[in-house]
Structures are given as structure tokens and as C-alpha cells.
């Protein structure tokens, strides 16, 4: 499953890039060839990019736990969500591998909706919150540094 995992990561990274750049949901869910070599993606991952998660809505039945199915569950929730909380609840209520799918959803939705969209009680109950905030601050500072061409 390693080649599929790598392709899913490539696709997700392109989507996350779009979200961090402030793009709308349609642009996030369909990143263009400037960010991704679409033709090189394995067929199951290309179907995700083409919106298979819209046609194959995740169910509460037992999943195969494959990376493509997890990505589809997260993207389906993101596509339908109106806020951060609603999408998280949709993913966790699927039951199978919901922790992983919710983590994937949370990255994308957090980048799209912003930190203040995450319910305060959830943010305040994070374990090692200080370490997470410090690390996020360092990542942001690093991203803001001008890089030589």
C-alpha cells in the first residue's frame, strides 16, 4: 500500500497548501497541476481527486481501513461541513478508524476555518497545549523567512 499512501499524502499536501493559501473549498478539493503531477497519481487516488468521495459517501459499516477510504471519509466531511465541529462529529460518528480520519479532517478544516473555529473547550483541553502552540509558532516563523531562489 506504500505507493498509494505516498500519492494520498501528495494529494493531501496540495489540498492543505490551498487551504493555507486561503482558497475556497472547491479550489482546495481540486488542486491544479501547478501543485500536483496529477497524471502520476495512482488510479485510486486520481478518483479521489475527481470527487469519488462525493459519490461514495462513507458509511458506518466496517471500512477496510485503507488510506484511500480514510482520505475519502475526511474529504467527504470537509466538503459537507459548515463549521469545524460539525465535520469532526461527522467523521467520528463513522466509527471505523475515525481517529485517523478525524486527524486528517482536522488538519484541512483547521487550515480552512482557522483556529478560532475549533470549539474553545476542545482547544483548552488539549494535552501539552503549550508545546503544540510553541511548535506551531516556530513553524510559522520558519515559513515567514525569505528563502533564496
Language model features with spans:
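Accessory "access/gating" subregions that flank catalytic or transport cores
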Residues: 17-95, 140-147
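Catalytic phosphate/nucleotide-handling subdomain of diverse soluble enzymes
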Residues: 1-14, 69, 73-149
Amino acid at each position: 500500500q506504500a505507493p498509494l499512501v505516498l500519492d494520498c499524502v501528495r494529494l493531501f499536501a496540495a489540498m492543505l497548501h490551498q487551504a493555507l493559501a486561503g482558497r475556497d473549498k472547491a479550489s482546495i478539493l481540486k488542486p491544479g497541476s501547478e501543485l500536483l503531477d496529477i497524471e502520476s497519481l495512482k488510479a485510486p487516488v486520481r478518483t479521489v481527486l475527481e470527487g469519488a468521495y462525493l459519490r461514495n459517501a462513507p458509511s458506518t459499516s466496517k471500512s477496510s481501513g485503507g488510506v484511500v477510504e480514510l482520505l475519502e471519509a475526511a474529504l467527504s466531511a470537509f466538503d459537507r461541513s459548515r463549521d469545524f465541529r460539525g465535520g469532526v462529529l461527522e467523521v467520528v460518528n463513522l466509527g471505523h478508524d475515525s481517529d485517523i480520519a478525524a486527524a486528517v479532517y482536522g488538519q484541512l478544516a483547521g487550515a480552512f476555518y482557522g483556529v478560532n473555529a475549533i470549539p474553545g473547550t476542545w482547544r483548552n483541553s488539549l494535552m501539552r497545549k503549550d508545546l503544540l502552540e510553541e511548535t506551531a509558532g516556530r513553524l510559522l516563523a520558519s515559513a515567514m523567512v525569505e528563502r533564496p531562489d
